[in-house]
From Swiss-Prot:
Keywords, sorted A to Z: Glycoprotein, NADP, Oxidoreductase, Signal
Active site: 154, 158
Enzyme Commission identifier(s): 1.1.1.-
Lineage of source species: Eukaryota, Fungi, Dikarya, Ascomycota, Pezizomycotina
Xref: InterPro entries: NAD(P)-bd_dom_sf, Sc_DH/Rdtase_CS, SDR_fam
Glycosylation sites: 46, 110
Family: Belongs to the short-chain dehydrogenases/reductases (SDR) family.
Name of the protein in its database record: Short chain dehydrogenase helC
Amino acid sequence: MNTAIITGAAQGVGLCIAEALAQRNYRIVLSDIDTEKGPAAASKLNLTHGEGTAAFFHCDLSNLREIDALLSFTIETMGGFSVLINNAGYLRAPFLALSAQDIQDMITVNLTAPIYATQQAIKYWDGLHQGQAGCVVSVTSSSSFKTYASIAPYGAAKAGAAMFTFAAGAFHPRVRVNAVAPTAIATGFDKNRMRVETDRTGPGYTPEEEMRAMGLKRLQPQEVAEAVVRCVEDKGLYGKVLYLDAVEGIKIHDGYT
């Protein structure tokens, strides 16, 4: 039985991905910083799909050492894994009101952590007897291609994740690395949690500007999950970013077109 690791899986898109893969007989390790919703999500999957389907592991991606612990937990608990889903994200805005820690955490969670997790997963698969075919899918954002002043660090990190994915097609002959880049999602980030208090207004200070631009019609979490599953199952996808738009559908980018 295949096993998938999913970061940011306690709710929203991550949980939808977990459900979609569980329906395809995957075992799931859900990781998240939410120690209430995470275990509850794992319990629900076990109730629906059978005991042993899912396990929860607390993982704060702002600390890369916790990624090592997540992979070790999965290997010890599930006997290994064949799929890594880098779904977790972190967004704070507006840009000109951010602290140094806000900026650092956005870059780490949205860019450095997926890069490091992918590297460690590939090294794990490469070290297995005769090697093992593996699959990595990262959930980036339409901000990879077009971003806004108030969320500039987030957009920069997501653009980096897309560029990393384009290059990743050459990493290993048996490992496929792809990404999905959705526009605004119906659940999305909690606007109140993402805001940093400020009395200033204007470019770089107004987090609603990108919501207006991106949120005319929002994707459903299930639509994003379906695209992730496509990346997992389609053996012909290498180093691609699937841009998801609620109106225009899916566009596949390879870094050259």
